[in-house]
């Protein structure tokens, strides 16, 4: 089912400090830095390692899922997203196997890819995100 690692999402307390760390230690500058508003305001730097995206995000409030995760677990990996070829099929399979979803329907991320988010309480506490990204062409095997 998994074709590749689509992205690794890190939760951090200070994005500016982490951007500086990436540049100093890895020689990497972010491809973009974005600020999102709404129910889950955050500041995010995006890097790439091959086709894998690295998302480094600082929550800008204390009530978002990311902020609550950061408060409980500290900085680190929030989730790893795996690239797949059929989001709807993957969601149906996960539900048939007893998993709950964070959203009833497959959702579309701001960057245009389809996401399936398995509720960690039904996956042994681990957050799984499955991504069907139309910009990355893969065979369906």
Can you say where each PLM-predicted feature lies in the sequence?
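N-terminal beta-strand motif that seeds the catalytic metal site of vicinal oxygen chelate
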Residues: 1-19, 25, 75-82, 131-141
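Short, conserved turn/kink motifs that form compact alpha/beta structural patches or helix kinks used as
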Residues: 59-61
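Vicinal oxygen chelate
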Residues: 1, 5-13, 45-50, 55, 67-89, 91-141, ...
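N-terminal strand-loop-strand beta-hairpin
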Residues: 27-49, 53, 117-119
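A short, acidic/glycine-rich surface segment
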Residues: 31-33, 63-68
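Amphipathic alpha-helical segments
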Residues: 14-30, 92-97
